[in-house]
Design a protein with these regions (language model features):
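Conserved short strand/loop->alpha-helix "switch" segment adjacent to the catalytic nucleotide/phosphoryl-transfer site
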Residues: 16, 20-44, 103
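Short amphipathic alpha-helical face segments that pack within enzyme cores
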Residues: 113, 198-202
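Conserved subregion of the PPM/PP2C metallophosphatase catalytic domain
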Residues: 1-13, 20, 29, 74, ...
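Conserved beta-strand-loop-beta-strand hairpin that lines the nucleotide-binding pocket
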Residues: 1-5, 47-147, 178-184, 239-241, ...
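Histidine-centered phosphotransfer motif of kinases
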Residues: 39-54, 195
Length: 354
């Protein structure tokens, strides 16, 4: 079961904990000494910023797949460092991203360095609401990039917050690619703790062999794979990038919202539990997929009062940032989440990016 690190940062002793967590995640991702040092530096800078400029916050560290699965190669793993706060926000984001920028009034110190050293870097900041920063650090590429195709114009990202600071989350998300098909899955193992994590991890492993089948067929395969576990609520969304079609099927209490040009639509899962009580009939929903679409999947750890905003429908933000902003704004320091919570987002690659 993969580790997930949730480090609250409210005093200087936790900065070291963040650095150690980044180093441990880098070892799991198979990074070499140089990239491990980079991950540790980025994590340390972001944690230090939380203390000095945001009054504290939390750092989530996970090992994730790349945001774009080039040529179907989904074996690469990156360290994802996400800093989340409810602080004053950044008044001038472009200035904050300059190397050496610092101010005691808003977050900013070291962000330019973090952006330059990371493989992927993005942030969202709103005055009075706080800042979310997501950075990914992976291995040095060992060959030329594959020729782009339709599937390279879709990207995914997410965050995973374990309940009560546990080492393992009972929630998991993953995505895979087979040709022009890209498939995003979110699983919520029954309950929380190691056994819930085992169920959701089993779903992730089984998904790798189901990249070429429909969401309904993927759920049937996952149901067989999860036999003998606690079971899990699972939602599977698949985009046929050449046809421009989204297909969705879910079982259990996984939230699914599709933004279509600024209008939100619910995608409905059927009652049941994959691995123990799968419904006999699995219905798929379909929708058009275009460059103005954003899909959000979330476990029931997200409060039911959460409603998407226009920011959630951003097609330019990194999906991991969208997921983290969703998680932050659906809770608060006074009302923390009460269960493992995962949010995963599927979005187009902006047209102005390679």
């Amino acid at each position: 079961m993969p580790r997930v690190w949730d480090v609250p940062v409210h005093d200087s002793t936790r900065v070291r904990d963040v650095r150690v967590a980044a180093e441990q995640a880098a070892a799991l991702a198979g990074l070499d000494e140089g990239r491990t040092a980079t991950a540790a530096l980025v994590a340390t800078e972001l944690a230090t910023n939380l203390l000095k400029h945001a009054g504290g916050g939390r750092v989530l560290i996970d090992v994730v797949a790349p945001p774009v699965l080039a040529g179907g190669r989904d074996g690469a793993r990156l360290v994802q460092v996400t800093a989340v706060d409810h602080g004053p926000g950044i008044a001038d984001v472009p200035a904050a991203l300059g190397d050496g920028f610092t101010t005691a009034r808003s977050l900013g110190a070291g962000l330019g360095t973090c952006a330059r050293l990371s493989d992927h870097f993005d942030l969202h900041s709103a005055p009075g609401r706080g800042t979310v920063v997501a950075a990914r650090i992976g291995a040095v590429p060992d060959g030329p990039a594959a020729e782009p195709g339709p599937a390279d114009r879709v990207r995914a990202g997410g965050v995973n917050l374990p309940f009560g600071g546990a080492q393992y989350s009972g929630d998991a998300w993953a995505w895979v690619r087979a040709g022009d098909l890209v498939t995003l899955m979110l699983a919520d193992g029954l309950g929380h703790g190691p056994e819930a994590a085992r169920a959701s991890t089993t779903a992730v492993e089984a998904l790798r062999d189901a990249a070429h089948v429909t969401p309904a067929d993927a759920l049937r395969r996952l149901d067989r794979a999860l036999t003998g576990t606690r079971g899990a609520a699972v939602a599977v969304a698949q985009v046929d990038t050449r046809a421009g079609v989204l297909r969705f099927a879910g079982v259990g209490n996984i939230g699914a919202r599709l933004c279509e040009g600024g209008t939100w639509r619910h995608l409905v899962s059927r009652p049941g539990i994959i691995g123990t009580h799968r419904p006999t009939t699995l219905r798929e929903e379909t929708a058009d997929w275009a460059d103005d679409r954003v899909l959000v999947l979330h476990s029931d750890g997200l409060p039911s009062r959460w409603t998407p905003t226009s920011e959630t429908c951003s097609t330019t933000a990194d999906p991991a940032v969208t997921a983290a902003v969703t998680l932050r704004d659906a809770s608060s320091p006074a009302r923390p989440v009460r269960d493992d919570t995962a949010v995963a987002v599927l979005a187009p690659v902006p047209a102005d990016r390679p």
